[in-house]
UniProtKB/Swiss-Prot annotation:
It is a multi-pass membrane protein. Glycans are attached at residues 123, 221. MFS-type efflux pump involved in the modulation susceptibility to azoles, including fluconazole, itraconazole, ketoconazole, miconazole and voriconazole. Confers also increased resistance chloramphenicol and thiamphenicol, suggesting that it acts as a pleiotropic drug transporter with a broad substrate spectrum. Finally, increases the tolerance to cycloheximide when expressed in S.cerevisiae, but not in dermatophyte species. This is MFS-type efflux pump MFS1. Keywords: Cell membrane, Glycoprotein, Membrane, Transmembrane, Transmembrane helix, Transport. It comes from the Eukaryota. It is found in: Cell membrane. The chain crosses the membrane at residues 30-50, 80-100, 102-122, 133-153, 163-183, 191-211, 234-254, 264-284, 306-326, 342-362, 366-386, 400-420, 426-446, 503-523. It comes from Trichophyton rubrum (strain ATCC MYA-4607 / CBS 118892). Induction: Is slightly over-expressed in strain TIMM20092, an azole-resistant strain isolated in Switzerland.
Length: 536
């Protein structure tokens, strides 16, 4: 390249850099009491979303007793996840072309309507519909909270607040089963959903009163029809049913239907066809696509999304299956197993906040990716060593290591997206990250369920030959000691332990794979500087 050409390229780069800087200078900087109220409201909104992921788990037995709908158990969780995954990416476009404040408030309102339907549900079908409606609102809440942070706080101060929101997500994800058990045992399972109404009302009021409209680059001269056409309706028409087909195949495969069943094969085939169509229209659509290729081609975005997919998946496997170990092996109740998860919660929250503060202080987030990968992998690996005799010190210590790893990395990809993208692209970048985390959790909780169920059945056959494995599956973890004949109990507990620890191998492998995202992450600073790692 000629010197002139090089200067021209440098000038273009500087122009883009300056454009990004100018974008961030237009942020409505909020301070003092107003900022505290807004951040509190945003944290409460994230609490709602994360609680609803897991709070229903311990309430399901009472719900099925009341509605006599044992066959609907899978739908209580999957209907919520299906609509979250189906609508999450489209919210990225909605936040780009419509006012952030009003989109966020509408998302919370939809979530509240869904929660009210669930709480008042007269039958199982109404509960499933309510969960699906709540999932639509939930799809726009977490990403919306992070987008509001982006529009309200300077980039260099943002990681600390992002860390606080990430910590709230971790608390609620793990505390959900504990709260669900407490409500179900002492009040009513309906309060697992009614509790969302006052919390959501506080969030709505705090945002409505204290948040000014962010300075978005909106074309107010466009008609609503023109804006709606920018939401990539063709891509959305391919994407939503493709994700639903994939999740249904994983939800039903190996449990309700064998993997070679025609329904499961058909779902995978339809998924492959539809997702291929979605990818084609994304490439063809350019900036009008739901996932603009120029954003996904950025190294930090692709690496951060992969990292969050793997770490998030590992985290959700442990969130769902670690309490089962406490119930089946240690004889804990549903509520007690939630309390025994506190070491992981505390370390996750402390490290999430500390990670955000560290990035704010030093500017660079890339080194913390490696810390997260190492700690999460070691912690997950240590958890796979559990036996029926594992001591209290070990199960506390191993949880702390795992939680510290997840907490360190959970919010880093959001920070990376906000550091490398201009402000008008932050909404889409944030939603891409959140979608990968949600999809990873949805996919691998289903994978974990299949691994666990199949290994438990085989283990019971080997360890307790005279016992029907289906009896063990129906009894559930909390009732093992009460319902399984004493002569079979030791063998069943060994089978449970082996099935669970091998399920955690999946989490360990995912944590180790996150190193790909760590290595791929660019070394950029939230303070506006870029450094390169030292050459080997």
């Amino acid at each position: 390249m000629t010197e002139k050409g090089a200067d021209g390229a440098d000038g273009l780069t500087k122009a883009k850099s300056n454009a990004v800087s100018e974008d961030y200078e237009t942020v409505n900087h909020v301070t003092g009491l107003k900022l505290a109220v807004i951040v509190t409201g945003l944290c409460l909104s994230v609490l709602l979303v994360a609680l609803d992921n897991t709070i229903i788990a311990t309430a399901i037995p009472k719900i099925t007793d009341q509605f006599h709908a044992l066959e609907d158990i899978g739908w209580y969780g999957s209907s919520y996840l299906l609509t979250i995954c189906a609508f999450q990416l489209i919210f990225g476009k909605i936040y780009t072309f419509f006012p952030v404040k009003w989109v966020f408030l509408i998302a919370i309102t939809i979530f509240e309507i869904g929660s009210a339907i669930c709480g008042a549900a007269p039958n199982s079908t109404a509960l499933i519909i309510g969960r699906a409606v709540a999932g639509i609102g939930s799809a726009g809440i977490f990403s919306g909270a992070l987008i509001i942070i982006a529009y309200s706080i300077p980039l260099e101060k943002r990681p600390a607040y992002t860390g606080a929101i990430g910590g709230m997500y971790g608390i609620a994800s793990v505390a959900g089963p504990l709260m669900g058990g407490a409500f179900t045992d002492h009040i009513s399972w309906r309060w697992c959903f009614y509790i969302n109404l006052p919390i959501g009302a506080v969030t709505i009021l705090s945002i409505l009163i204290f948040l000014k409209h962010p300075k978005q680059k909106l074309d107010n001269n466009q008609t609503w029809k023109a804006r709606l056409l920018k939401l990539d309706p063709i891509g959305t028409a391919f994407f939503m049913p493709s994700i639903i087909c994939l999740l249904l195949a994983l939800q039903w495969g190996g449990t309700k239907y064998p993997w070679n069943n025609g329904r499961i094969i058909a779902l995978f085939v339809v998924f492959a066809v539809l997702i291929s169509g979605f990818i084609y229209f994304q490439i063809r659509g350019g900036d009008s696509a739901t996932v603009p290729p120029r954003i996904l081609k950025k190294r930090s975005i692709a690496s951060g999304a992969f990292f969050l997919f793997t770490i998030g998946s590992a985290f959700f496997i442990m969130v769902y299956y670690l309490p089962i170990w406490f119930q089946a092996i240690k004889g804990a109740s549903a509520t007690s197993s939630g309390i025994m998860n506190i070491p992981m919660v505390l370390s996750l929250v402390v490290l999430s906040i500390a990670s955000g503060i560290t990035v704010t202080a030093i500017g660079y987030y890339a080194p913390l990716y490696y810390v997260s990968t190492v700690l999460t992998s070691i912690g997950a690996g240590l958890l796979t060593t559990f036996t029926t005799e594992t001591s209290k010190g070990k199960w506390i210590g191993y949880q702390i290591i795992f939680g510290a790893g997840v907490g360190t990395g959970l919010q880093l990809s959001i920070i990376a997206a906000q550091a490398v993208l201009p402000l008008e692209d932050v909404a889409v970048g944030t939603v891409i990250m959140m979608f990968c985390q949600t999809l990873g959790g949805a996919l691998f909780v289903s994978v974990g369920q299949n691994v666990f169920t199949n290994l438990l059945v085989k283990g019971v056959v080997n360890a307790a030959p005279g016992l029907d494995p289906q009896v063990v599956l129906r009894v559930g973890a909390t009732q093992l000691k009460n319902m399984i004949p004493p002569q079979f109990l030791d063998g069943v507990q060994v089978a449970y332990n082996d099935a669970l620890t091998k399920t955690w191998y999946v989490a360990t492998a995912l944590a180790a794979l996150s190193v790909i995202g760590s290595v791929g992450m660019e070394w950029k600073s939230v303070k506006g500087k870029k450094i390169e790692p030292a050459a080997a």
